[in-house]
Amino acid sequence: MLRALCGATIFTLALSAHAALDIGEAAPDFSAQAALGGKVYRFSLAESLRKGPVVVYFFPAAYSEGCSVEAHYFAEAIAQFEAMGASVIGVSGDDIATLSKFSVQACQSKFPVASDEGQAVIGAFDARMPTRPEYANRLSYVIAPDGKILYYYVSLNPGKHVENTLGAVRAWRQTK
């Protein structure tokens, strides 16, 4: 029994630690329908990178408990990201109507969330959940203004995504 439990734990940890885009690799450019404060617009990663680093965080589904908690944490920390010249966007496979509401409620109208119903962006960033590929994994990337991956963090637990991405932006900022 103990051996099976240890094996399952190691397998789970291996799955949660996977991300195909390595630090220093070019992030895939994308544009997508997004919502900020209930207003729908076209988000462009290239445009956002002209202003500074971008945190692109993927989440499984709007209004699920962990995703709502994570959005709340990012909303509470958005002023800290902005103070360092960084912006944040969440991405999921939810439709834009759902994300439009989510952008007001969970995101508190403080940052946009993008719809990737066809999962093109999720696939390009290797952000599919290994055990449920119809959902995005909880995966956060920090992308430098030159389009290179500075940092990534994978964990289904939403608790450390904000803290870790803030730390990565702060570390990048100190080199500038």
Language-model-derived ranges and their functions:
Residues 28, 53, 137-139:
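Short loop/turn microsegments at loop-to-beta-strand junctions
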Residues 11-34:
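N-proximal helix/coil linker or "cap" segments that precede and/or mark the start of modular domains
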Residues 109-111, 128-141:
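Structural micro-motif
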Residues 1-6:
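Bacterial N-terminal signal peptides that target proteins for export
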Residues 135-176:
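Thiol-/selenol-based redox modules, centered on thioredoxin-like
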Residues 31-53:
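A short beta-strand-turn-helix
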Residues 45-72:
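Short active-site neighborhood of thiol/selenol oxidoreductases, capturing the structured segment around
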Residues 68-107, 119-121:
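Structural microenvironment flanking redox-active thiols in thiol-disulfide oxidoreductases
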